[in-house]
Amino acid sequence: MPVIRVRRERLESLTGLSIGELEELLFRLKCEVEEPEEGVLEVEVNPDRPDMYIGEGIARAVKGIAGVEEGWDPPELADTPLSLRVERVPQRPYIAAAVVYGVNVDELFLEELIQFQEKLHDSLGRRRAKIAIGFHDLAKLPSASVEYRLMTLDTRMKPLGYGGSEMSFREFLLADEKGSLYGGLATKDNSHPFLLSGGEVIAAPPVINSEITRVEPGTRDLFIDVTGTSAELVAKTLDIIVASLAEREGARVGRVRLEGPGAVWASTPLLSEAAAKLDPGTVSKALGVDLTPEEAALHLRRMRHNASPAGGLVNVRVPPFRVDILGEVDLVEDIAISIGYEALGPRWPGKFHGGSLRWETHVYRAVKDLLVGLGFTEVLQLVLTSPRLVEAAGFSSMAVEVLNPVQQEYSVLRPTLLITLLQTLRENQHRRKPVKVFEAGNAVYLEDGEPRDEEKLALGVLDEEAGFEDVQAPLYAVLRIMGVDFEVEEASHPMFMEGRTAAVKVGGERLGYIGEVKPEVLEAFGLEYPVAAAEISLEVLARWTSRT
């Protein structure tokens, strides 16, 4: 959870509320507040609210839920002389920029601004891999024309924090910790993205800014750039930053014109609101409270949406900084937060239905317990297996193949558990004899051209002289204990020897097969000892097992 450090006095000044009121309201907004040192608050913010990673964003949310302000007034976008030419930068193709006038940076706000930048880098930016942010002193820009393009690693710049010393970007990557952390994110074939103004490098995103445009106490206006690998995320991040800085008293937002072959937008920031509709009936079903469209709209406005009733529904315009709003359910959650979960109160449901196990599950568990009691060990294998083994088992015509397998050895769904059972016996054939194992799981096979998923049970015995009776006896014991009347008849099976194979039937329905594995199958699976095995359908068994 992101923890935001902010001066208590500053937050009280921004909201007009006492620390006690702030703690209560922030708790409703899913935040926790601590004061580890006098005058400094640590606010643990929910990670889906990056708009609250700075004092202005926290204040905006708190004033809304407190009823001090409602909705959100988008700032007017003023034209500026700034233009940004975007060349093609394959490894980091997207860039957006904006100007915010009247920010008036002081020592305390500079600390928060840097913190805001790094929290966004770590969360939305995935440690700068997705997006990176640059803050620049607008007055220090060498030119109103800015350019974003690839240049070689030998390009010289004045990295931030080096007192104006000039070095090549290659030298910086080797000398600075940020070079080792972020240098590989956009470096490719001896080239890297650079941001230039008046022919001078003002940034090498996502690694470092230049000393030329350093932001410091006394900076009045900011030029902001956001670069990244996702156009949507770049635009949203810039909107979050601009909307937060626009909350500062006297601040104004200016647009930057974008041009060139790599430009995605004509100008930025976008600051566009998303349109949505909410049915108060949905709120009632989810929260158990009946709200009129007017009441629902009021609660949404307190959560800083622009909302109004319309024909029994609520028209909602979601502000661009609320990137956590993905659908109707998120708006319902906002209403719950506005009302207060403590005000909703618990209520017993009109009907109560207790969960219980399926009858089939009871049968499956009983069978497994019986086999363990008969000296068998349960194993678990993957449903995916090798097409070579499926062919060796004689089940190729029934196999369901994976269209895009990661490995060829795991490209077919097992049509019978006997395949993976023999694999297990192969891996354990040099252990103390007899080796007795079973598996209950899913087999997937083609039936009338369509894939069918069936729960089955397979058991096998590997021994120096393993025979039909070694599996017949435990299987018969299980069926009799389960109260199943069954009959056995001679049959054929692709994996079992002729004359040593039997089909088990229950009520005329085939339950499964018992048999001794063919020598050629043993050889294909790498088995050096005889194996007797059986496979039955647990689904059929459950249908014919008495419920008494």
Swiss-Prot record:
GO terms for molecular function: ATP binding; magnesium ion binding; phenylalanine-tRNA ligase activity; RNA binding. The keyword Nucleotide-binding applies. GO terms for biological process: phenylalanyl-tRNA aminoacylation. One of its GO terms (cellular component) is phenylalanine-tRNA ligase complex. Disulfide bonds: none annotated. Its EC number is 6.1.1.20. Its main location: cytoplasm. Tetramer of two alpha and two beta subunits. The keyword Cell cycle does not apply. Belongs to the phenylalanyl-tRNA synthetase beta subunit family. Type 2 subfamily. Its cofactor is Mg(2+). This is Phenylalanine--tRNA ligase beta subunit. It is an enzyme of class 6 (ligase). Residues 271-346 form the B5 domain. It is found in: Cytoplasm. Mg(2+) binds at residues 324, 330, 333-334. PANTHER family: PHENYLALANINE--TRNA LIGASE BETA SUBUNIT, PHENYLALANYL-TRNA SYNTHETASE BETA CHAIN AND LEUCINE-RICH REPEAT-CONTAINING PROTEIN 47. Keywords: Aminoacyl-tRNA synthetase, ATP-binding, Cytoplasm, Ligase, Magnesium, Metal-binding, Nucleotide-binding, Protein biosynthesis. It comes from the Archaea. It comes from Aeropyrum pernix (strain ATCC 700893 / DSM 11879 / JCM 9820 / NBRC 100138 / K1). It catalyses: tRNA(Phe) + L-phenylalanine + ATP = L-phenylalanyl-tRNA(Phe) + AMP + diphosphate + H(+).
